[in-house]
């Protein structure tokens, strides 16, 4: 049974596709020089689909309690998802880390991009693949 296929199917796409780019809408030619628009990250369609599938998985598989990702991380003494050793964690923890990064994007622009660029998301999805065997 492939419980995590909705998420793990994105592995090849996330490895090959450009994840997106930073957008900076500020211009040097602003006549007043007083307007400022914070930079933001625009994700590729493949990453946007992955994000949508994470939320869909959380909705259709409530037994993983992904909405309580912070509590799951705290209960497992995970203070930094980027420093945690995924090879020793169960599916609940891996899914909590994935949701933590997706939700964290709302508070820190580019948080998901960091997880993708540094291979953390790839490692977590590979761990879910291992756990399915």
Feature map (PLM): residue ranges:
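N-terminal leader regions
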Residues: 1-2, 6-7
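Eukaryote-skewed repeat-based solenoidal scaffolds used as protein-protein interaction platforms
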Residues: 7-11, 115
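Extended alpha-helical scaffold segments
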Residues: 13-17
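Charged, low-complexity interaction regions
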Residues: 18-37, 41, 59-64, 82-88, ...
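Repeat-associated, polar segments at repeat-unit boundaries in modular proteins
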Residues: 60, 66-72, 120-128
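Short, charge/polar-rich alpha-helical segments
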Residues: 75-93
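Heptad-repeat amphipathic alpha-helical coiled-coil interaction surface used
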Residues: 91-99, 105, 114, 118-132
């Amino acid at each position: 049974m492939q419980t995590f296929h909705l998420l793990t199917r994105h592995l090849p796409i996330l490895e090959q596709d450009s994840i997106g780019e930073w957008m900076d809408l500020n211009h040097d030619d602003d006549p007043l020089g007083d307007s400022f628009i914070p930079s933001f990250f625009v994700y590729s369609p493949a990453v946007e689909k992955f994000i949508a599938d994470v939320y869909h998985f959380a909705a259709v598989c409530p037994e993983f309690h992904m909405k309580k990702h912070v509590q799951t991380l705290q209960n497992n003494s995970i203070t930094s998802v980027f420093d945690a050793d995924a090879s020793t964690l169960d599916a609940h923890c891996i899914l909590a880390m994935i949701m933590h990064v997706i939700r964290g994007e709302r508070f820190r622009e580019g948080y998901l991009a960091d997880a993708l660029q540094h291979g953390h998301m790839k490692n977590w999805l590979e761990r879910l693949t291992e756990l399915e065997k």
